[in-house]
Each structure stands twice: as C-alpha cells, then as structure tokens.
Amino acid sequence: MTDHDSDFDGGASGGRETSSRRRFLAASGVTAVGAVAGCLGGPGGNGDGSSGDGEMNEFSLGSFQGSGPFVGSRPEPSGTSIRDLPNLSGTFGVALGGGEGGLYIDLFEELEEIYPDLTIEHRTAPSTDLANTIKQEADADNVQQDIFLSVDAGSLGVVSEAGATQQLSADAISSVPSAFKDDERNWVGVAGRARAVPYNTNELSASDVPSTVQEFPDTLGGSMGWAPSYGAFQSFITAMRLIHDDETAIQWLEDMQNAGVETYADEFQVSQAVADGNLNAGFANHYYALRVKAWNDDPPIELAFTEGDAGALVNVSGAAVLTGADDTAAATDFVRHLLSAEAQEFFATRTYAYPMIPGVQPVGDLPTVDELDAPDIDLTELSDRGGTLDVMREAGLSV
Amino acid sequence: MSATDRFERVPSLPSSTRDRQSLVLTLLAGSIALTLLTPMLWVVLQASQVPLDRILEILLRQETLDIVLNTVVLVTAVTIGSVLVGVPLAMLTVQTDLPFRRFWTVLAAMPLVIPSYIGAFAFISATGQGGAFTDILAPIGIEQIPEIDGLVGSVIVLTLFTYPYVYLTTRASLLSLDGRAIEAARSLNHSRLSAFRRVTLPQLVPGIAAGALLVALYTLSDFGTPALMQYDVFTRMIYVEYDAWRLDYASIFSLLLVGMAIVILAAESRIERTDEGEAYVNRGTDRPGTISLGRWKGPALAFCSTVALLALIVPPAILLYWLGRSTGGIGGSYEFQWIYAWNSVYVSSLAAGVSVLAALPLAYLSARGESRWASLPERSSYVGYAVPGVVLGLGLLYFTLHYVDSLYYTVDILVFAYVVRFMPQAVGTLRSSVLQTDRKLVEAARTLGHSSLSAFRKVVLPLVMPGVIAGAALVFLTSMKEMAATLLLRYPGFETLATYIWLVRSSADYGDAALPALVLIGVSGLSMLVLLWRGYDVQE
C-alpha cells in the first residue's frame, strides 16, 4: 500500500513563459448545440477508439461540475466545448495514474454517457508503476494502451524519454500555455497544482508571509509545518536546486530545521494543523487548504504565494498519446476532450486543480494561473527526485 | 541418521531406475525453482548498473545502517511475539481441556484472513486523539486511548496478523507428537515442566521454526504496516528510491533484503538440522494425554479471548464504524461490484492450485533427497516471498515482456506472480507433511509391486493431504490480500478486492474503502472456514 502516490505529486516538463490568454469561442455549456468541428479522426483499427463518427447524447455542464462547495457562484466556462469536438467512439485504452479516488474515472463515465459508442478501458495504478510498465513495454516494442493520463508529470517525462509517446498536434494543445506542455509536444498538462503557503488568519495577515522562500527560516520558520516525505514537497526542493544549487537547498533545509519547523506525514495534515491553530503557517499544495475549507465551517485558513521562486512552483497532471494507439488522430481527439471547457471545469470544481485553459477559472478566490508568479523552470527536470533525496539526507532529514 | 535409513534401498529395484527417478525429480524441482527465480533477473540487471563505489557508499551511509537496524529489530520482535502468542494457543487447543476447544481452534487461525494493512489502518484510526475508540468508549468514561504507532504499533499489528503461521505449524507438530516419550519422561520422575522442556519442546522446535520463518519473511517484505505506522524499514526505503526513479538503487536495497532473507533461511535450516530429524515422524497414534487446566482455565480463556478480540473483532468493528460515514475525502463514485470479489477468489484459487502442484516436487526432494543440495530448490523458492511486491512485479513484467509475451495482459501473469510470492508457504507445510509420513510405508508399497508413482499416489498423497490443504489455504489467503504486484500486472478492467480498496482508499474516504475491506475479510474468512472444516486438522 503505497501512500506516496495517493495524490497529485511529483513533476516534470515544459518551459514556463508568459501565457498568452487566448479566448476561444465561448461555449456556454448548457445551450450550445454540438457542431462537429474539424473531423480529424479516421476509423480506428483493431477495435481501437475512433473519432468523428458515432452518436452523441445531450448533457449538462452541471454533471461535470458536481455539487461541491465552490460550484455555486462560478462564471460560465469558456473554451472549446465538447459539443464542438469530434465525437468519440470505439474503445480507448487509458493508463490512468494515481487514484484521486476514482475521480478521473468519473470523468470517463461522463464521457461514456455522452458518447454511447464509446468505451474507456482504464488500467489504474500509481503513476510511477504505470510509467515503469509503459517504459518496459516500449523496450519490448509492445506498448498496449492508447493514452497515459498521469497525476505526476515526471512519469510523463519518463515515458516520452522511453520513446513510448506520439507527438500531439500543435492545434490540439494550443489552448494550453507553453509552460504546461512539452516543447516537443509529447504531452500536455490537463490540470495544475500550485505550491502555496497556507496560513492561519487569526495569527497572521497576508503581509506577514514573506514573498520569497529564502526569508522563511528567519521569519515564520519556528511556527511552521512541512511534510518532507511527500512527493510534492520534494518537487519543491528539486525546483529550489534547479533555480539555485544543491548547497542553497541544503542550507535552507538546515535553517528551517534549526528554526524549529514541525514535521507532518502529509500536506493535508499540515493544512489542517494550520486551520486548527496548531501552526501559524505551512508548506503545502494549494488544494489541501481548499479541502480543509470544504469540510470545515469557515476555518481560519488562507493561502499566500511566494514570487518567482520554488515556493510558487506550478506543476501539472498531464496526458500523452502512446505508441499503442493505432489511430493517433482519434487518441489526440480524446486528449482534446480532456482540455474541453467541460472537462477543465470538472478538474477545477471536483479536484480543486488549476485549469489549464484560460477560459476556466480556479475555484474559490484563488489567483488565476497567470496571476501566480511561477518560477521559470523546465518542468521535465523535476524528475531528478533522486538528487533531491540525497540533498535532503545531507541536510539531516529522514526521507 | 536413523533406523529408517536401513530400509532406504529396496533391493528389488535396479539402481538405474532409482537413479533415473531421482534425476527426474531433481530436474523437475530445479526447473521449478529456476522459474520462480526469473523475476530476480531484472533486479540483478538493474543493480549491476550501479558502480561499485556508489554501492558501497549507499550501503555504508548512516541512514542505511539505521534502517537495517530498524528492520532487524522489527523482524526479531514480531517473530518473538508470534511465537509467544502462537505456541501457547497451539498448546491450549491441542493438549488441554480448554472449554470450546474446537471453536478456539478455528478462531485462532482466522487472523490470517485480515490483511495487515487493514489491521494497521484499524488500529491507527481507532486509537489516539479523536480515534474511533475514544468515540465509542467515551460514554463509559474512558477519555483517551494512547495512539498506537511506530515500532510498538508495527509489532502489535504484525504479530496479531502473522502469529497464525506459528500457531498452525506448531499445532501440526503437536498433533504428531509421540505421547509415549512424555510418559516415559514423567515416569522417570521428571516434573511436567521438565518433561515439556526436555521432551516436548525439542520435538516442537522444527514446527515452531517453520512458522517463525514465514512470520520473519512476511515482516521483512511487508510495506503497508510499517509505512502506515511511520516506522522506517527497508521496504519503505525501496519505495522511496523507486518513486524517485532510481530503480537501480531500489534493486540494490531489494538484493540486500534478499540477503537478509537468506540469513533468516540459514538460521532456520540450522534449527531444523540440530534436531534429531525424526521428531516429525508419526510412528503411531499415541497422542499425549490431555492436560487439565484446573485453575488456569480462566486465564487461558482470557488469553484466547484477548487475542481474538484484538485481531478479529477490532478491525471489522472499526470498518463497520467507518461504513457509511463520510470522512472528508474528495469524492469519486467508482462503484463496488461483486465481480471484484469473484475475480479475487478466482485468481487466488488458481494460484493456490498451481502453488501446491509446483511445491510438491520441491518439498518431496527437500524432505527425501539424499544429496546435501537437495534442499536448495526448496530454500531458493523463499526468495520471492521476501521481495516487496512492486519489485517482484517489475521483475516479472520484464521477464514476461521479453520471453513469454503471450502471458502479458492475461490472468495467468497474476497467477504466476502469486505463485512466485506465496508458494513458499505451501512448500513449508508440504515439506513437514512429507517428513511426517513414514518411509517404511512407501517401501512396503513398493515391495508389494507398486510403481513409485503409484506408491506415491496411494500411500504418500493421502498422508500429505492435510499439508496440501493447509498450503493451498495459506497461498489462497495471501493471494486474496496481495495489492502491489496486482496493481502492476492486472489488465484493464480486471479489478480485485485489493486493487479496488487501493482505488477508493486514495480518495481518503474511509467510508468507501470499508465495504470492500469487509467483503475481503468476509470472503477470505468463509473460504478459511470451509477449508478448516473440510479437511485440515480440526477433527483430530
């Protein structure tokens, strides 16, 4: 039973640049009627999935949003609607990394509701397991599945390095800022997560939280918590190593420990401890504070973000078309569906993730992805978690 | 050795036939053992990619040494704990006038049906501040139960759910105990305690050691319990490196784990060899007389009840407590289907069947072989049992994809994985059964003109049947619980109870995970009852 894979974590790939906020035709979910645009898909072979033909049922945006606590006052999502994408049919084999409590499976079920001829056969396992499996399949020239959907971008990097991916068309992923997709178009981000500093609003105000990570040991360090064994924390340290160097990371880890930072098992616990007043602040992925808010009555917790350094890292879950897909165009159309306004709304409202297309807003009062000052690093390099383990051990942390 | 050796060579058989038969058996056992070791090929290949100086650096750094020490402490403590629980339970249910003996006999074996990761989860969520126990016990004035975690928590949980290995093997030894020796000792003025120490115990030691071996190796390879209890051991180190894309490092640690397993195996072999080697042989039906518990009846019952309460009542009770409660997970509605239960039963049954068939030659050769190498195939089969599931799964994946890719994406690869991981349990029980059958019976059948195969079928097989059933039961139960390798090797659409538990557990919603966990325990429990009642040693 692996606990490290239970959530969004890990990371790699894509160069962060300023995103151009492209507006796509506003498809106000409920009313627009499906027009089959750009039928790229041919008929699939060997029972593979295909696109362009097949039937489509009527659906509502509400079934994508679910009934979570942040749904109430949301603006209509804009972007390409599922109604404007080629219909999907046949069978798609999807390697689905991570659990997310079957949430992504819910998305698949929504798609199967819409397309009666569509079957999605998913094989769900920890992302690391699947990446290693696909890598081995690629070595034996026997990649089985069409699509890899991973909660860990590092896994996507490993798979594309193994030559197991097919290039996505530039058109299909044009709505995603270049920071969140591979330069070679081997994969694309479908949902993002930001590093954040949850703080207790009874103890601190937003201005008390320093704007760079390096200032924390001398300011809030003694009343903070972290979860060093957690994958996302390790990606954060990896980012620090990439921006500065190993020595800086070791020094920072030592300074934080000397300041008296408290260790927790995971970042949900860190966030809960902040809300309970046991900590003034912590290091955690942004969505944990939202989960704490969703399950408690107005807890005193808010999020702060550092500026332009590792503390503001935005990492992604992403999708790749595998060499196992006979019909690349159809598989690409499947990926387009994950980037549709409805699917992005799903990721935002159900998993509290950052949407990857500019037409869909993050939940709550989170800053949009453009407003975050994320560091300019190549996400693929975050897969060097081994080097980070060495650094953390060097700093006396048990990982 | 012993008197029976004189009957070894049956004059009526030409020695060339004997040699040929023993050669066939050796070849068969050897190739089975090699097949079981195939997943290790990948592990060795991965490890060989790391330069030697780096290997030394990894092995000698403080963290590695700490973790070796932690692992040794855990394995030792759980093994001792299991002996302290399992042996008294076996003695009470076999040798005393414990009330409801048959009931306790079955109950004492039942904790095997509960996966240790579920047990660990139950104890963690039950104890400490805000735990379920605190909720339940608050009305009767108990305010707080200390949190069970770390080393203590790991030892308690692993002991509670692995002691049945020791219980079952000790019980089998007790049932074949020669009562006349004890009576002789008593008549020579030895006290009951002294007779136990000088006569009974030496005869029990190999049985206890066989069970303790399984406990030690299980503890060595278990990831879930120490991880949930936050106690740092080898398996967690392997997962950390695996997760950081350092398969080569993970492989080195896996080989180190195998090394530790070999040490344990060697220790157990020594214990067995120092014994006279004949303790197992059942010469007659003279069982030792029943010991009257007298005023110890109360404490004995209290002991049995406490173990049953902690191991069998607490986990299902906690699961029922969570059932239908929402605990702040993020939702997800991947619904439970009964086909998952059927899938689990189906692959686990196949694994049990194949394991028993494959174990027989190894066990027979090890028990009856004359060469000092005869035990090698049997001993080497334990390697798979000591390796964490994810490493074994990747090794199997490599072997399958490169050499037998027709197996890939079938149920067969899962069966193969379970056989590699869990067959040693069947080898162990079968070996003791073979040792218990008197060779003279086979020789007699042979002199009456039966071929060796026919003698085996007519004489040996009926006698080893309890061992076959016990072995099949153990493999079945552990296969039902297997999670790590199953996640890697199953094909799309094929979910077992364990993989479904993983799937819903990751939503952090305990309420959703409670139902499949209860079904897993229920289905395993029922299968266990059927097995126990049908053949295994309940009717003494």
PLM-predicted stretches and their roles:
Chain B
Residues 51, 171-181, 192, 231, ...:
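Transmembrane helix boundary and interhelical loop/hinge segments in multi-pass membrane proteins
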Residues 188-189, 202, 448-449, 462:
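Glycine/proline-centered hinge or cleavage motifs at structural transition points of membrane proteins
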Residues 220-247, 483-510:
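Glycine-rich helix-loop "coupling/hinge" segments at transmembrane-helix boundaries
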Residues 96-100, 175-180, 189-193, 243-247, ...:
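Juxtamembrane helix-boundary/capping and inter-helix hinge elements in multi-pass membrane proteins
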Residues 53, 57-60, 105, 138, ...:
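Short amphipathic alpha-helical coupling elements at transmembrane boundaries
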Residues 1-28, 270-305, 530-540:
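Transmembrane alpha-helical segments of polytopic membrane transport and secretion proteins
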Residues 2-8, 44-56, 128-140, 229-235, ...:
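Peri-membrane helix termini and adjoining interfacial loops of integral membrane proteins
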Residues 18-49, 62-174, 203-223, 252-268, ...:
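Membrane-water interface segments at the C-terminal ends of transmembrane alpha-helices
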